Regions:
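Active-site microenvironment for binding and transforming phosphate-containing groups
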Residues: 1-159
Length: 159
């Protein structure tokens, strides 16, 4: 399953899902092996690379989308200090935050009963924005390279 913040948070009502019901909730409803919470503890989940918590700058609407679903999500957002330069006027701009997308995914997975989560731990090694030699980033490379980024994943069932 691939999801950005909107898919993870369940932003917007689509495909019969209610607000706050994202792709993980939809997967649990549609995938027979994950339909019962008791089955989810045995499923191994792997989080792939994404923009990291030191680079993912978001507005209050993103923070609110997660907090409405789970108030504990507030821990995954760090306010960005917006200090103006000396003598500069302060604009009435909305606050900005650094969001920890891997931690938000792990919270969502834990709430659904998934206990075995590997892969992206939110460290800089997994950040697509700060690792240009390892990962394509549409945010970083889109204007220069177009939207032709590639990602491959292999998923296997183990008996």
């Amino acid at each position: 399953v691939h999801a950005g913040w909107r898919g993870l948070a369940g932003q917007g009502v689509s495909q019969g899902r209610a607000q706050g019901q994202g792709v993980l909730e939809a997967l649990c409803a549609a995938w027979p092996a994950a339909q019962h919470p008791s089955q989810r503890a045995a499923i191994q989940v792997w989080l792939g690379p994404c923009i990291g918590p030191q680079r993912f700058e978001v507005g209050p609407e993103v923070r609110q989308a997660f907090i409405l679903h789970d108030p504990a999500a507030v821990a995954c957002f760090v306010p960005l200090p917006g200090l103006p330069a000396l003598g500069e006027r302060v604009a009435a701009a909305a606050p900005k935050y650094l969001a920890d997308l891997p931690a938000l995914a792990r919270q969502r997975l834990a709430a659904l009963g998934f206990e075995r989560v590997a892969g992206n731990d939110g460290s800089a090694d997994w950040c697509t924005a700060s690792q240009p030699s390892r990962f394509f980033s549409h945010r970083r490379d889109g204007a220069r390279l177009g939207s032709s980024g590639r990602m491959a994943a292999c998923i296997a069932c183990q008996a």
